[in-house]
Amino acid sequence: IEQELPKDLEQEIREAFAEMSQGEDIAVAVRSSATAEDLPDASFAGQQETFLNIRGIDNILIAIKEVFASLYNDRAIAYRVHKGFEHAGVALSAGVQRMVRSETGTSGVMFTIDTESGFNDVVFITASYGLGEMVVQGAVNPDEFYISKALLNAGKPAVIRRNLGSKQQKMVYADEHSAGKSVKIVPVDKAERNQFSLSNEELVELAKQALIIEKHYGHAMDIEWAKDGDSGKLFIVQARPETVKSRESQNVMERYILKEKGDVICEGRSIGQRIGAGTVRVVNSIHEMDKVQEGDVLVSDMTDPDLSLIHISEPTRLLS
């Protein structure tokens, strides 16, 4: 991080940002984009760093170096080993993207397939207040919506299911604007928690865009979106192939039978359709990874990308 960027590269970055900002004090996201990212069988999602609400060219230059360095963080190295990629064969760029004011609006992720069952005739949309990282990281329980592709294409009411999430927290801009200090997490008002974060009209518009993107790429897609709280406009900020359910056979249905019965000690939103058993290990931070042994059931408060290190090194099951 202390190493200086090549002078010609730094000058090009400064000139490009000056053209983008036109003298305004704009907030940008500095995002990673690797040459091996978003392949049909390996998404690399969340393996490298992204920094939000970065302001000022000096902070942007530092954030770019942080992104470059994240190509060799622990989880990125472990993921490449797991997927069989040569370290030297993966290059990384840093994109500087003007931010949507979703900190005062909503954001989330949508899939052109049901991520639980693999049913491909719906668009599945998740939404919560504030910046989208909370949804992407699994740090918040978002609203969930299912939109029928057939009804959407027929011009009929297409929202067929809505699940109200707790949406207890949101990520917003912080007062500082440097990498690692530019965002903060605050509680969501009770009134907002108790109402859906998107209208039916907004859901239909997002779903239409999702189908356009899916048709363009010819593949089930994983799409990040954001709503500007100031203008009310919806934006697509990223799209990548969906790499899990879309690769499973559509001609096979697996069912699992629980052979023993016991007391229910906790319930939550299902993220899969399998049954696991083993010794429960509660992990409060990535620094407690050494607790986890092969076959354990890992319990964590959220699905942090760093936990992929545990999945790769030891076969485990995750409960968050």
Regions found by a protein language model. Give the residues of each.
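Short, flexible loop/turn elements at secondary-structure junctions
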Residues: A34, R98-V100, Y129, N200, ...
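Conserved metal-phosphate-binding beta-hairpin within the catalytic cores
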Residues: G46, H219-T243
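Single conserved hydrophobic/aromatic residue that forms the stacking wall/gate
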Residues: H311-S320
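Conserved catalytic alpha/beta cores of large enzymes that bind or transform nucleotide phosphates
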Residues: T126-D222, R269-Q273, E294, S300, ...
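NTP-handling and nucleic-acid-processing catalytic cores
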Residues: T50-L151, K156
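N-terminal beta-alpha lobe that positions the nucleotide/phosphoryl donor
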Residues: I1-G95, K190-E201, E205-G218, I236, ...
